[in-house]
Amino acid sequence: MAKIRVYELAKELNISSKELITLLEEEFSVEVKNHMSAIEDEDANLIKELLSGKEKSEKTKEEDDEIETTAKNPIKESTNNKKPNKRDDKNEKVNTENAEDMAIITITSETITVKEISDKLEKSYAEVIKELMLMGVMASVNQEINFEMAEKLAAKFDTEILREDEDEEDDLEDILRDNEEEEYLQKRSPIITVMGHVDHGKTSLLDAIRKSKVTSTEAGGITQHIGAYTVELNGEAITFLDTPGHAAFTAMRARGAQVTDIVILVVAADDGIMPQTQEAISHCKAANVPLIVAINKIDRPGANIDKVKQELTEYGLVAEDWGGDTICVPVSAHTKEGIDDLLEMILLSSEILELKANPNRKAKGTVVEAKLDKGRGPVATLLIQNGTLRVGDSIVVGSTYGRIRAMFNDKGRNIKSAGPSTPVEILGLSEVPEAGDKFYQVKEEKTARSIADKRKEKIRDEYLQSTHKVSLEDLYNQIQEGTVKELGLIVKADVQGSVEALKQSLEKLSTGEVKVRVIHGGVGAINETDVTLATASNGIILGFNVRPDNNAIIASEKDGVDIKTYRVIYDAIEDIKSAMLGMLEPEFKEVVIGTAEVRQVYKISSVGTIAGAYIQTGKLARNAGARVIRDGIVIFESELASLKRFKDDAKEVAQGYECGLSIEKFNDIKEGDIIECFIMEEIKKKTL
């Protein structure tokens, strides 16, 4: 059934949008959010009939009153034979026409540039600037004016300007509204989230279930990014989400709880309830998600299952064998004891929940992870929560969109379609989406682009300009002097999940004296654009597992922008916290002494991998620190194990020369890798 916007109907009826909204709510009990909301044609026709009926009755009454007045006061012949004023008639006619034919334009933000409003009004920049000057506003083409000023300006050109603040989610829900009656629903697999404290064995437990070694691929044995995996048990599929356990990734855990059906809370039998365990319990309760407690490491000396159950009661979780309704399963990821019992409990709980979805509708779900791949472009891991997603479908994801070019399952196999509760990796998006964004399948790419563009315009950042640069070393002094009221940070990381976690952790550091604000977060190497943004917004750049490119380094030195890079997320948080408290006392400074590009790779059985490299900048020195950078992301960090010039050992090799080198404990060197050589210089401590 066709629909009509409130403001369009108001224009037809020649009344204000506000009057129409009131009429809809009082006379028809139709609730609408604002002038941009859509109503059914049937309701619109009823309103037209009602108003036309009122107009007729009012008109009849007016005529009766006029006749009565005429009878009481007969018209006297005018002694003044003055002709009617044609100018007045003309003006009255023009005003009436303008009221009826006034053009309407919409904007989606609080501000708009002079250029944008000129284009919308279809007037030259000179005309618009002239009108602004007459209104006492001096503005150039690229300067912004607020909504109130834009409204007054539009009125000068017989145009009404409206603020479009509708939620696109409503539009999408309208687009996606399919039949969800019982006959269309089918049983779907449960989505399981594994939560718990650091090192309590979450990933090891998943390894035991999947019979694979994920932990060995993660730096330091700690899961850094969310992964989604599907396992088969007795012919039934179970989807697992592995959320990192350490405190800085609270946001990731919260995101996992929003899409999950059942949470497995892993608690070490020898450790008991820890801070992150408490947070996980809170997330589950807030999301109203069923909980199964896996008491892990029961093979360890000092394991005490009863102690864990006792601690759980303090948080309202009473084990079934203690008379409660919380399922507790003792397991050992190491010996695989209790794994089968745990899986049986998952399937039993999912049967009770009666999980269903409609595979024959348009797909929708959530982004689990997203990153930028040099060869494949934006790559996103999606969890389909309803409907079926196919290769070739158009989707809108947050403020980005795309048409699916390829789709892979959790095992890396190319697939053509995927149904509810299935995690997939897709290619074809225009940009890297935010982890946790909702995705929706739409009819065509044009619709997806339109919705994404609206969202981009809506969330466009307005950056504050400042002249004084901030660095971590002098941040405390500037806070004390009152120079800094807001600390702007640009966060770059290797994957979107890390960006999100860093943003949330850093913004929590805000105090009464200074507010910490992440003005931008993105995936990939630190580039010149990031430095430009930091310059304009008086910010500091933080990199997690990424490095600045050459242009960024040159620009940062020129503009005095502070760039800090980290491999451990807590170091970044502690540095900002210490700087704000005036406790930042740097003892060593990393100095990059040179970079080299790997041109050829040789594998020698007795030695390992030798790289033939060309020195691009500075020099390489033996025994100096070295990191391998691939596509702007730090792959490995160690030191140079050997450095040769031809067949001779060399202490150092200068810029413009070629050399052979090997990296300590690292053999996965590839052509095109950048070897960054650095030393740690001791510097004087600063008193802040």
From Swiss-Prot:
Biased composition (Basic and acidic residues): 86-95
Region of interest called G2, as start-end residue ranges on this chain: 221-225
GO terms of molecular function: GTP binding; GTPase activity; translation initiation factor activity
Keywords: Cytoplasm, GTP-binding, Initiation factor, Nucleotide-binding, Protein biosynthesis
SUPFAM superfamilies, sorted: Initiation factor IF2/eIF5b, domain 3, P-loop containing nucleoside triphosphate hydrolases, Translation proteins
Compartment(s): Cytoplasm
Region (G5) residue spans: 332-334
Region (G1): 196-203
Residue segments, region G3: 242-245
Residue ranges of the region described as G4: 296-299
SS bond list: none
GO cellular component: cytosol
Domain tr-type G residues, every copy: 187-354
Keyword Signal assigned: no
CDD domains attached to this UniProt entry: IF2_eIF5B, IF2_mtIF2_II, mtIF2_IVc
Residues annotated as binding GTP: 196-203, 242-246, 296-299
Chain residue ranges for the region called Disordered: 54-95
Protein family: Belongs to the TRAFAC class translation factor GTPase superfamily. Classic translation factor GTPase family. IF-2 subfamily.
Purpose of the protein: One of the essential components for the initiation of protein synthesis. Protects formylmethionyl-tRNA from spontaneous hydrolysis and promotes its binding to the 30S ribosomal subunits. Also involved in the hydrolysis of GTP during the formation of the 70S ribosomal complex.
Protein name: Translation initiation factor IF-2
Organism: Clostridium botulinum (strain Okra / Type B1)
